[in-house]
Amino acid sequence: MKIIISPARTMQVDTDSLLYKDLPEFLQQTKDILGWMRSLSYDELHKVWGNCSSRLAMKNYQWLQQMDLQRKLTPAIIAFTGLQYQYMAPSVFSEDGLKYVQDNLRILSGFYGILRPFDGIIPYRLGMGDMAPVNGYKNLYDFWGEQLYHELYKNNDLVISLASVEYEKAITPYLQTQDRFIKCIFGEEINGKIKQKATLAKMARGNMVRYLAENQIQTIEGVKQFNIGGYRFREDLSTDEKLVFELVK
């Protein structure tokens, strides 16, 4: 079983808490992206980053010029510090939990492609949905093409998606009939329908990863037992492609 999650905008450098094990699988492609980004002016990069203040854009522009993809690396699982990762709390995982996520969890990334938890990375700013026509490609979805799909499904695993639509779109266009891809929905029931709110969903996704790791879950039935934070599985609203979890207040 493989679990996919999105990265986070907020990141840190932490070379002390955990040691990285490998370099990312698609490091050459990352170097290509970095080279393209360095060829852009500040104004051009600011447009790529979109909804980003001038102060933050300048900070990232200056950082970009000195980025070294092979020095001062942080394991991806603790490099990202957004809400999902805070609720995941990988720093308190047991050894078994850390081994579980290394084997089963994959982080999708516009900059790195696909990451194992202990791949060594550095802070960057580039979302999969950002307007980045790298080296003549239309956007990052076009740049990565089928590569991330093939890496994810190379062992024909069941894939549980805890990723946002922005990152799922790097995988779903390439799914074949035999592929098993199941999306998890976390929300509240409003007028008979489950409505998902971004902040609560990020918290639930982090809790789900922690639950899966702590309990060494390898089956769909195990995933359905998730009940952290007041959620319960709704069999009646779920399908073969979607597991729905309702927040019960």
From Swiss-Prot:
GO cellular component labels: cytosol
InterPro entries noted in UniProt: YaaA (IPR005583)
Cited Pfam families: H2O2_YaaD (PF03883)
Biological processes, Gene Ontology terms: response to hydroperoxide
Stated family: Belongs to the UPF0246 family.
Protein name (Swiss-Prot/TrEMBL): UPF0246 protein Lreu_0493
Organism: Limosilactobacillus reuteri (strain DSM 20016) (Lactobacillus reuteri)
